[in-house]
Structure formats: structure tokens, C-alpha cells
Amino acid sequence: MSSAAQSDGNLLAAKSRRLGEHLRSLGRLLVAYSGGVDSAFLAWAAYRELGDDMLAVLADSPSLARSQMQDAVAFAQERGIPLAIIQTAEMERSEYRKNDGFRCFYCKDELFTVMEQFRAEHGFSVIAYGVNTDDQGDHRPGQGAARQHGVAAPLLAAGLSKQEIRELARAADLRIWDKPASACLSSRIEYGREVTPEA
């Protein structure tokens, strides 16, 4: 192994340890879970560190493809990750249906509002989601909603990039390590065109 490769490996191992330490510091944890690489790896890592003091929360929404939802449920079951399915109603919000450049804000605001109610009712301490270092700097209104709701970002706190998350997932033999990125169904509708369940 070259010294550069060894250095990269040491850095990634350090980030993985940092992630574990951060997760343990959060207490009873809800993870916003969609089945994508980031949220699936975060849910797995949280379960590894916290056991039954974590719960992955999957939103059953018209904007989530049925095949993606089924795969998300299957992955959680395969890994023994505790899972709850909640209902969100972003389609009932006129500002979401309007489909301007802030649609993702209203979607995440709906998600985190419902998760916050769930958190309070079931005695969890913190909500976390799977944003990473590559998500910084783009137009990401959903991150604004996360900040407003005080949602933790453990992968970001550990300094993990998308590629590093894939590498750690592969090392852990998680089948999602090479899963392609997949946007929600609503993102396939051009801005300015109303979003409806039928669109």
C-alpha cells in the first residue's frame, strides 16, 4: 500500500470513529430514512452505535416511488434496523404544490414537523438526517428546513463526503454502497408546474 493510500485510509478511519462518537453523544435518536446511500448508511451506523436507542423513520409519501419505499423497508429488515413508517402530507400544502424553487424546503419542513411530533410522543432526544460535505454550497432549501428544526447532521459533523460514505458502506458489506442517487418523484416536474399526486 502506498503512503498516500495509507494516509487516506487513516483519515477515513478517523472520520468513522468521529461519526461513532458523535452518534453516541446524541442520545435516543430518530434518523430520517429514505433508503438512499446516505440515510441508509447513517441508519446502519446509528444502530451499530445505539442499538434500540435509535429508530429509522421512513415517510410514506406520494413523492416517494413505491419501489424505493419497498427497497428501504427491505434494507432495514435485512440489517435488523428498527423502523417506523409515518405519513406526511406535503401534497396538501399549497406552497409545496406551487413548485417554486423552494419546494424541497416545504417537503422537509413537513417531514421534520411530523418527525418532531413523533419524537416528543415517543421520548427520543434528537432527529438526524443524512446530509454530507458534498451537499454544501448548492441550492439546498431542504437544509434550511433542517436547520430551522434543529436537526442533527452526523455525517456532515464527521466530515464525510459522498464517496467516503460509499467506501465505508462497501467496507461494511452494505449492499447500498453503490446505489445510484435517485431524486424524489416531484423533482421530475419542472419548476412552476403544479405538483399533484397524479402529475
Language-model features and meaning:
Residues 2-171:
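ATP-dependent adenylation/nucleotidyltransferase module used to activate substrates
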Residues 156-199:
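Mid-to-C-terminal catalytic subdomains of enzymes
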